[in-house]
Amino acid sequence: MFPVVEGRPMREQLRFLHLNTVQLSKLLQENVPSYEKEPGFEQFKVSERSHGNWIRLYLEENNSEVLFNLGARVRRQYLDALRTLRLSLSKRAAQYDVYSMAAGTVLVLEVLALLLLSVPQALGSRAELDVPLLSPVCSLLFYLLLLALAALHVAVCTAADSSCYLCSLPWLAAGGVMALTAALLCAVVSTLTRTFAGGKCLSQNPPQSTSRWSELDLLSFLGTVGHVLSLGASSFIEEEHQTWYFLINTLCLALCHQIYRNCFLGDDCAPQRCPHMGEEFDGVTVALQGKRAGPEGWELSRAPTDPSSLEALRGPERWMVLASPWLVLACCRLLRSLNQTGVQWAHRPDLGHWLTSSDHKSELSVLAALSLTMIFVLVQKRCSLTSKVAMAFGLLGIYCYRAAIGNVLFPWQQDNKDISKGITEARFVYVFVLGILFTGTKDLLKSQIVAADFTARTVGLWEIHSGLVLLAALLLRPHNLPVLVLSLAIQTIMTQFIWRPLRHNVTEVTVMHYWFGQAFFYFQGNSNSIATVDISAGFVGLDAYMEIPAVFLTAFATYSGPVLWASHLVNFLTSKASSGSALSRACFCYALICSTPVSVYIVLVTSLRYHLFIWSVFSPKLLYEGMHLLITAAVCIFFTAMDQTNTKS
């Protein structure tokens, strides 16, 4: 506040500070019965008396240095009083359930610690995640921790001013929370002990070869850590889309450098790895350096045994590989101009506002028709004939729905006087969405029964992906259809000309899918503010408000970018019959890179609960992170269901 009034005369400065201090003191009197004993109120009274002395000197027309020094001291007293009053009011007005918050934070950190300690095992040659829960539960440490937590719970809940959420739960539920906390802590200790024991064996038998980080490994690690650290500043949260735009642009430049180096300088210094060729998974990139001997070994990177597939490319294919990162960069730059989001530049007009204005409805109609056509072209290539027909009719129904509600026009339509809710048209599309999803699910069940039927599995997964694309096209606004088209186009470019020729490992491919999914979340026009949620998506095809369908449709429309990129990741990793343990690794990597920022952010929000922007910036972001975590859990369940490594073995 002081920089605002700094250039004013001393009399006006003190007057402004006095008015603000009076307002805060009145709020303190309304909220605190014994406000006279508060330090802030006492400082306010001292400041008022000093202010009165300064006014007497000022009225005596004393312009000496004494008047200036006294004014500076009064100003400092007012600022101290304002700071103390603000802190007292924040603590009084915001009563937090610290006990429940601490219990939840401990649970989250325990899960994160288990994930981090399981990196060598989960990304090793067998790709197995073994969390030791049974043996720690039978240990003495578990019962000692459970007894200590129960004593703490009784002490907190029997306090005079206790109003905690955990205390309101039945004893059975609260006991379950305490038992889970103790079991996870024992599992962390057990995993840590096993890791240190393995480290001693590793030091006695050092590896013969040294492992090193590739450029993409460093970029993935530094980008993830940098994003996590940026969540501690409110400005970075408000403009988080800029962080993701920067990361994917840097990723495209790193891929461009890798492609040019492999094409023109050879692959002597560039290890090539294939994420979906069974034996080559032994060299998966992990977040820790080192190499363990034996079948459970893991290493950072591995030198290639086969020649690079880039050497076999000739003519147009080779040039497409060279140009693919620049095509992706151009698509991302175009998408940034479509929707302005965040806070700093949200007021600036963008292409989306221009398209949605009533004067440009014809242009929007042409763009929507072209986008729906391109969606069909990009998706139908791997679908069955029945799904292709259903996709075509579904996309036609989407255009009819948008025309019925007045968003677009038919070529023979001059105006949109006959506007309706489009319920019939939307339900017509829902029929085809459910039909495509049912066909894909049927093929997946068939592949589970007949283990050798690999084609049915890949077709079923792609048809489920196609059904989700059709649902997203229905729920997204017409001006956002190009976002969906460019998302599918980038997936095709990356698959054909980057991931397969460069043979990236599972970790790198998973991180890229996650980053692009986050970027497309913001390309849709979303932000970390609740105001950008498109509530209308929850009412598509509904006569009245229905809670469960509305919540599902709104959540899917909001997070369609991350969901579609995760679905494409499953399809990409299962596109080869010898996919091995790719899905297990991808599931672990996806869970780790999503849970890390959430866990750190929960700790930050807990520590910054009295921050000035806690309700306007940090709390909405926490809601977004919670919803994103639920979607990630659903994605990981889908990954686990699709993983047939154990059944094949």
Where are these regions (language model features)?
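Alpha-helical transmembrane segments of integral membrane proteins
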Residues: 96-649
